[in-house]
Design a protein with these regions (language model features):
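C-terminal functional module detector
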Residues: 1-111
């Protein structure tokens, strides 16, 4: 069995992003998505499964919002208050993209 990904609705190349200094987002998104799709490789003799995967446009992670709310600047011009050092760490993850998956739909051929 092999897995393939098909884009059915939305736009994965919509240039959406987030301003890391304010957490304001830009780019287009969708309030709702709907699509109809047929498997171009469907073979009634082979078992298969299908599921929907949704990926949200980027947003600020909670820790980045905390850094902004406390006016943390990582430019070296002012000391970073105790406890906020992770705001300026190289490995600080500032954004995230939430993901969701549906339950699979299984197809089993009558053998």
């Amino acid at each position: 069995m092999h897995e393939r990904v098909y884009e059915v609705a939305g736009d994965s190349h919509n240039a959406a992003g987030v301003d890391l200094d304010s957490c304001n987002t830009w780019g287009t998104g969708f309030d709702a998505l709907c699509g109809v799709w047929r498997d171009p490789d469907f073979d009634a003799r082979q078992p298969s499964f299908y599921y929907a995967r949704v990926i949200e446009n980027p947003t600020c992670r909670w820790s980045q919002k905390l850094c902004i709310a406390n006016h943390i600047r990582c430019n070296g011009q002012a000391p970073v208050p105790d406890g906020f050092e992770p705001c300026c760490a190289e490995n600080h993850v500032r954004t995230l993209q939430e993901r969701a998956w549906s339950s699979p739909i299984w197809y089993t051929p009558n053998l």
